[in-house]
């Protein structure tokens, strides 16, 4: 019996395997992949899981070099299978802990897409499922390392998009304020008039720190 299900992305254009019992992709990869509206030479999917963001971006941007970093080895193996099934020559996945800086990629990426774990380990009860545990829970120290590495991996004129919990926004902004960045926050609402659960951050390098707010993304009209 297979441990993963065979699903599809982009109305069947992309074959997508993911764990049956473990972390399964939600709306976040679709929102992040939709932010890629220009041509970028080098794109990093930081925390790539089974690869939904990378697969969509590689399909839509065949001339871009797309790399996925993922710590969980089971997720990584499935992402490699997904790449093989879809035959994307511009995509590769690496087993890598996003909280550990890889100097080989310093100032390397034009674009970074990332959906770090949402929940702080000391504030919630953690799942015993390793796949879910790796995908949903993180310490405050490790989230700070993750964000720091995003900035270090970006080129001077690079851009990053990050989705996380709306309630974590103040914590993340305090970290980002240490850098010269322009940060635009966009609340993500399930319905018009509802309270935001998640937030999209757009980050670009700047001469000094600037914070902006954009109109909310509403998932269900």
Please place each PLM-identified region on the residue numbering.
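Conserved Class I SAM-dependent methyltransferase catalytic core
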Residues: 15-17, 21, 141-196
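Glycine-rich, phosphate-binding/catalytic loops in enzymes
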Residues: 33, 128-131, 178-179
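Residue-level signal for inorganic ion chemistry
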Residues: 32, 115, 146, 203
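Short, well-ordered coil/turn elements that cap or connect secondary structure elements
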Residues: 11, 61-63, 88, 106, ...
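Mobile active-site "lid"/loop adjacent to the S-adenosyl-L-methionine
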Residues: 116-145
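SAM/dcSAM-binding transferase cores
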Residues: 190-221
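SAM-dependent Rossmann-like transferase core, predominantly class I methyltransferases
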Residues: 2-42, 48-59, 202, 211-213, ...
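Conserved SAM/SAH cofactor-binding pocket of Class I
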Residues: 34-105, 111-125
């Amino acid at each position: 019996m297979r441990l993963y299900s065979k699903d599809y992305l982009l109305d069947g254009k992309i074959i997508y395997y993911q764990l049956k019992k473990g972390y399964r992709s939600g709306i976040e990869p679709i929102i992040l992949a939709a932010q890629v509206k220009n041509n970028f030479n080098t794109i990093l999917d930081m925390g790539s899981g089974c690869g939904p963001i990378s697969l969509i971006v590689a399909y839509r941007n065949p001339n871009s070099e797309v790399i996925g970093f993922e710590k969980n080895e089971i997720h990584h193996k499935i992402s490699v299978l997904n790449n093989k099934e879809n035959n994307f020559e511009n995509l590769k996945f690496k087993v890598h802990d996003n909280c550990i800086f890889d100097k080989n990629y310093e100032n390397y990426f034009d674009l970074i897409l990332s959906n770090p774990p949402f929940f702080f380990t000391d504030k919630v009860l953690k799942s015993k499922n390793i796949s879910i545990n790796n995908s949903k829970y993180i310490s405050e120290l490790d989230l700070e390392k993750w964000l720091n590495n995003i900035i270090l991996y970006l080129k001077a004129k690079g851009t990053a998009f990050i989705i996380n919990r709306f309630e974590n926004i103040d914590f993340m902004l305090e970290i980002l304020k240490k850098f010269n960045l322009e940060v635009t926050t966009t609340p993500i609402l399930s319905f018009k008039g509802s309270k935001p659960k998640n937030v999209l951050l757009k980050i670009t390098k700047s001469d000094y720190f600037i914070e902006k707010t954009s109109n909310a993304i509403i998932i269900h009209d």
